[in-house]
Amino acid sequence: MSPPYPVEILTLFPGMVTGYLGASILGKAQEKGLLATTITDIREYAEGKHRVTDDAPYGGGAGMVMKPEPLVAAIEAAKARHPGARVLLMSPRGPTFTQATARELVRHEAGLILVCGRYEGVDERVMAHLDGELSLGDFVLTGGELAAMTVVDAVARLVPGVLGNVDSSVTESFEEGLLEHPQYTRPPVFRGVEVPAALQSGDHARIARWRRWKSLVLTHERRPDLYARVVLSKADQKLLARREEEL
């Protein structure tokens, strides 16, 4: 059995992270020895009675900046615990995290060290101790904790054995550059809306055709940016020429 995929999160607010990492799929992954998470309070590496981790910015301005001394000390300690792990700061100025990023990170078996920023940002001198920065998109959060949990969740789902169904991570949205097809469960009719006939047919080939067709249609309608990058096969082109009742 392979060793668990290691993740360490450096944060000023461990309580924000603890509950999420211990619940649902992530909690079960740790119980099964597939994922190993460590949550480190950056304040443990701050000196002085009050363990101060922030200070006013040089040049003036609103807010406070995270000090380099405790943060670099925490990063160095995490690196010692996880040799070779990628060290990434959750930051709005980093490249946008995508499913492709998650696949790249899970292949790095030495694991991840995620640094959660706070306040107006992090002293620039910390950057020399990172492997990079990572963003969820063009918006600003109060801190990096939510972003870090998102990254851990997406990466952990790709660790072999974490998802009960081996096909689950392969058929989800974005794995083929397409949105996932809609899902239905019982009852077959709810408030007059019926589950598509193809899904009730028991014909696996027909079900696969419907799912592929719906995935293509949804992506075209809702994410034209993704659809523009899709290379349609001849089979896809034939599917798109058909109506739903013809599938």
Curated annotation (Swiss-Prot):
Belongs to the RNA methyltransferase TrmD family. GO terms for cellular component: cytosol. Pfam families: tRNA_m1G_MT. Homodimer. One of its GO terms (biological process) is tRNA N1-guanine methylation. S-adenosyl-L-methionine binds at residues 117, 136-141. The lineage of its organism: Bacteria, Pseudomonadati, Myxococcota, Myxococcia, Myxococcales. It is an enzyme of class 2 (transferase). This is tRNA (guanine-N(1)-)-methyltransferase. PANTHER family: TRNA (GUANINE-N(1)-)-METHYLTRANSFERASE. It comes from the Bacteria. Keywords: Cytoplasm, Methyltransferase, S-adenosyl-L-methionine, Transferase, tRNA processing.
